[in-house]
Amino acid sequence: MTRPLLSPEWVARLKQFKKLIVGFSGGLDSTVLLHVLASTPPLSNQLLAVHINHGISGNSLNWQRHCEQLCLDLGIAFIAKAIEFDRSANVEEAARNARYDFFSSLLEDNDCLVLGHHLDDQAETVLLQLFRGAGVDGLAAMQECSNLGAGQLARPFLTCPRVELEHYARIHELKWIEDESNQDTKYSRNYLRHRVMPLLLEKWPGVAGNISRAATHCQQAKANLEVLAIKDCPDLLNATDHLLIEPIKGLEFERITNVLKFWLKKNRIQLPSSKTFHRIIHEIIFAKLDAMPTVSWNQIQVRRFQQHLYLLKADQINLPKAIKWQQFPASLTYPDADIKLSAVKAQKGLMIPKDAQIEIRFRKGGEEIYWHGQTKHLKKLFQEWQIPPWVRDRVPLVYINDQLACVVGYAVSDLFFTTNPLEAWSIVNNS
């Protein structure tokens, strides 16, 4: 008697979620997964199948229609999404990132994304990471359960070999899509699947399970390293985009690297190379006190100001441009610069004259504001407020009729300040 693909433990675990979003490509793995979930009464009414149309194959629309029809037959809610991604570099990675970004955007609290990855997929992932020279994090490969966006990600088939999924599909006479690109060995995973794994299986029939078990050992080692990182630097528990340097300077090189890895992962940053970690430690952490060095990779920057490391992402590096706030007090958003301004009524604060022209600008140098009874240079105020230099260029400046009226989050000009709650506004940057 064959074991069920979905164990009672998995049924109990998945039953706790409000909604189960199934990544449904229409291939063997996701077709079996969807059928198993739809055939499990405690779970069948929680399902939403999501098909991602990458637009790579000429058959994409036919695949989408196939998936929609199967969901109609099973009585499962279905949505399809065509995604855009950069096709100039690593197509596999770019498509994967775009796919997970969309899945993440769908997840709400107590939702779970369920994917059909199986044991053979896990073995391939471990080998691909090994060939890239990955460390413990990479060799830990895919986890059965992890966080994703506001919800969770589950892979209930991760210990099931592909042959068990094929057996289930034959018994239930399921039809699935065969993506022709899966045979193209120019893609690394396909090369491994069609050229390398058959040789390994010929010599060691149980090799996929053994490799997968090694990933489990690496996951435990990864968890232990994360515990060590918090022990070495308790500030990690509260750290966001900045990290105090002093507590880690006395650690050994490897343990500093471990702390940095934890910090970057917490901020959802793909880990850089060992060479980059070496540069962060030697060029930034152990730099002179008055130095402000920078290390960059993949549109990410790590910088230093005073006794802190600062992490900057792409939308924090791009400098925003001036824009008129024509719909004041409606919110104003800079989608490419991680800035969202809102105006809220206040007991005291910024006064906006009737029919005023409001414009949001950013520092270029030479700005002055009349504040606390004096005309002050904005540059000196930024220094007094101990704002890191690269942040200064991104602090929104509210100009009213061409006069600097407010430095958002820091100061309101005396010329535009009021204590009348009927007239006062507070400008808030919600980024």
Swiss-Prot record:
It is an enzyme of class 6 (ligase). It comes from the Bacteria. Pfam families: ATP_bind_3, TilS, TilS_C. Disulfide bonds: none annotated. It catalyses: cytidine(34) in tRNA(Ile2) + L-lysine + ATP = lysidine(34) in tRNA(Ile2) + AMP + diphosphate + H(+). SMART domains: TilS_C. Keywords: ATP-binding, Cytoplasm, Ligase, Nucleotide-binding, tRNA processing. One of its GO terms (biological process) is tRNA modification. Transmembrane segments: none annotated. Its main location: cytoplasm. It is found in: Cytoplasm. GO terms for cellular component: cytoplasm. ATP binds at residues 25-30. Its EC number is 6.3.4.19. Belongs to the tRNA(Ile)-lysidine synthase family. HAMAP family: tRNA_Ile_lys_synt. Ligates lysine onto the cytidine present at position 34 of the AUA codon-specific tRNA(Ile) that contains the anticodon CAU, in an ATP-dependent manner. Cytidine is converted to lysidine, thus changing the amino acid specificity of the tRNA from methionine to isoleucine. The N-terminal region contains the highly conserved SGGXDS motif, predicted to be a P-loop motif involved in ATP binding. This is tRNA(Ile)-lysidine synthase. It comes from Legionella pneumophila (strain Paris).
